[in-house]
């Protein structure tokens, strides 16, 4: 149920919108207008009409159960792929063939692609049309920021997708061109929203429909700036000059970055009644369709990380233990007892977080390591990132943790089977100025990865971009040789429905991809050999 004293007639409008944007298997990029879409007369004033489309977008960057979508939609679109590949969440569903084994389930891959286009791109297109007609450039700018927040996750999943000329062409754009468009859009949006809030730091926009910041434009500009910094770092190996340019634009912007828990981007429980889908999947889907991944549990346990109790529950023997991805089981009961930890999530308080405050510090730490002008040094930003993550998770002081130069990731001991694993990494929490570039980068990304949990799309992207942290490989690799077990999965293949309904577009995507349409082909920004 949507809170914030929204009148019943608005609920009917949102219901009409949900029907209008119902997920379909065929996406028409040329004219994405649903004949069942709610009419202007039904929607009433422009503000209500635009707000309803915003409401749709904010609930689709990360899928939540809202009457139209279900927790199972999040499960198939994200948890069974990104969250696993990031080393965060392992699937324990009774199945002998699934995404975790690199045996891609077509309906799940379809969901990842389709939900983004029907839930983000379609409503954005409507907002863009209304805002352009009404001369509301700040509304258009806000919608564009949300669009980029959602769609970069999809581009980072598949590679080339329809984006640059969305609405006018069904062709797939090369990923480098999509990123250029991201930066163009974010730069324009930051300028427009910055001007809107200039001289009035409390300026509001779409406050009745904003489940993230309650309409605070100042906070949205910080988010947009930090998002630009995130995407700049993503292309650091593919286009170093562009990466540095965009990163320095963000850091030097007068509108600031996300630096505190109060400014982090999350679905606010005070503005929207919802629960984190992982909580439902972990506790109520067949008594638990997922558990913590062995990788992150082994890291946090071995590093004596106090955040581990905030992330996961204790096992029956008083310790912490996870599950490797890529397992093959038809007996889920092995993973539903107390031998394995569970996710420490509360249905009423655990938020869905789009961007943590800690991330901005780790991004600047890496930028400083690369010699960019980040306004500080790598060590200081690194330690600030860890401290802010501790604050965000209410894990106490980080002083002892940051001084620990001996603790390393713990060897994984399978409590159910015999799929044990010993790490080769010797990374510790304490900064070591004597480390070379790679040693410092591994430390930054390892702590960033821990702080990002459970944001699977971002964790997986950073692993592919940098090769860090060392993640435990899959137990079963069913890719028939298309995915290297040690390098791990690099992307999702294009969807069955798109190959049927938009064969020409998919062909353009494969051509731009520069490799086979399988999970082993690297994306444009994925340049490292590790």
Label every PLM stretch briefly.
Residues 44-48, 90-398, 433-441, 447:
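Structured, solvent-exposed acidic/aromatic patches
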Residues 18, 22, 66-67, 395, ...:
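Intrinsically disordered or highly flexible coil/loop and linker segments, enriched in small
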Residues 1-35:
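Bacterial Sec-dependent N-terminal signal peptides
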Residues 66-77, 160, 244, 456-461:
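Beta-strand acidic-aromatic groove motif in beta-rich domains, primarily in extracellular
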Residues 390, 394-530:
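C-terminal functional modules
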Residues 2, 26-84, 469, 479-530:
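Membrane-proximal, proline-rich intrinsically disordered regions
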Residues 25, 56-60, 123-126, 249:
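Residue-level detector of alpha-helical secondary structure
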Residues 33-35, 340-342, 420-425:
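Short acidic (Asp/Glu) and glycine-rich catalytic loops that position anionic groups and cofactors
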């Amino acid at each position: 149920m949507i809170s914030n004293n929204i009148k019943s007639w608005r609920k009917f409008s949102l219901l009409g919108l949900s029907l209008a944007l119902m997920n379909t298997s065929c996406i028409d990029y040329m004219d994405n207008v649903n004949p069942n879409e709610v009419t202007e007369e039904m929607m009433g004033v422009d503000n209500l009409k635009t707000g309803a489309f915003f409401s749709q977008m904010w609930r689709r960057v990360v899928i939540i159960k809202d009457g139209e979508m279900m927790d199972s939609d999040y499960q198939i679109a994200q948890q069974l792929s990104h969250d696993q590949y990031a080393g965060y969440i392992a699937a324990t569903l009774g199945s002998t063939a699934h995404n975790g084994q690199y045996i891609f389930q077509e309906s799940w891959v379809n969901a990842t692609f389709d939900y983004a286009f029907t839930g983000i791109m379609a409503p954005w297109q409507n907002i863009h049309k209304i805002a352009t007609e009404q001369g509301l450039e700040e509304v258009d700018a806000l919608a564009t920021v949300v669009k980029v927040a959602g769609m970069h996750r999809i581009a980072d999943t598949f590679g080339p997708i329809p984006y640059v000329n969305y609405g006018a062409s069904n062709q797939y754009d090369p990923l480098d061109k999509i990123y250029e468009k991201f930066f163009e859009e974010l730069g324009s949006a930051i300028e427009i929203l910055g001007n809107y809030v200039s001289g009035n730091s409390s300026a509001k926009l779409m406050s009745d429909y904003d489940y993230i910041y309650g309409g605070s434009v100042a906070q949205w500009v910080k988010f947009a700036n930090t998002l630009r910094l995130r995407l700049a770092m993503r292309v650091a190996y593919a286009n170093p000059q562009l990466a540095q340019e965009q990163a320095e634009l963000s850091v030097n912007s007068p509108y600031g970055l996300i630096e505190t828990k109060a400014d982090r981007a999350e679905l606010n429980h005070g503005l929207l009644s919802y629960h984190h889908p992982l909580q439902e999947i972990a506790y109520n889907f067949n008594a638990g369709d997922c558990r913590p991944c062995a990788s992150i549990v082994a890291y946090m346990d071995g590093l004596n990380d106090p955040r581990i109790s905030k992330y996961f529950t204790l096992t029956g023997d008083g310790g912490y233990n996870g599950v490797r991805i890529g397992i093959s089981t038809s007996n889920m009961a092995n993973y539903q007892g107390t031998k394995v930890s569970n996710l420490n999530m509360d249905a009423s308080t655990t938020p869905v977080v789009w961007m943590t405050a800690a991330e901005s510090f780790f991004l600047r730490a890496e930028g400083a390591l690369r010699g960019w002008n980040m306004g500080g040094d790598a060590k200081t930003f690194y330690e600030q990132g860890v401290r802010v993550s501790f604050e965000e998770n209410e894990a106490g002081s980080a002083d002892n943790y940051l001084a620990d130069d001996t603790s390393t990731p713990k060897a994984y001991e399978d409590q159910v089977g015999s799929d044990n694993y010993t790490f080769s990494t010797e990374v510790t929490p304490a900064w070591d100025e004597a480390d070379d570039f790679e040693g410092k980068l591994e430390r930054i990304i390892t702590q960033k990865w821990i702080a990002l949990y459970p944001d699977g799309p971002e964790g997986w992207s950073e692993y592919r971009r940098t090769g860090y942290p060392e993640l435990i490989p899959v137990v079963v690799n069913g890719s028939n040789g298309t995915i290297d077990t040690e390098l791990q999965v690099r992307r999702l293949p294009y969807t069955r429905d798109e190959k049927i309904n938009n064969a020409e577009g998919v062909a353009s995507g494969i051509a731009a991809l520069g490799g086979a349409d399988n999970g082993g082909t690297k994306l444009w920004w994925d340049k490292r050999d590790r």
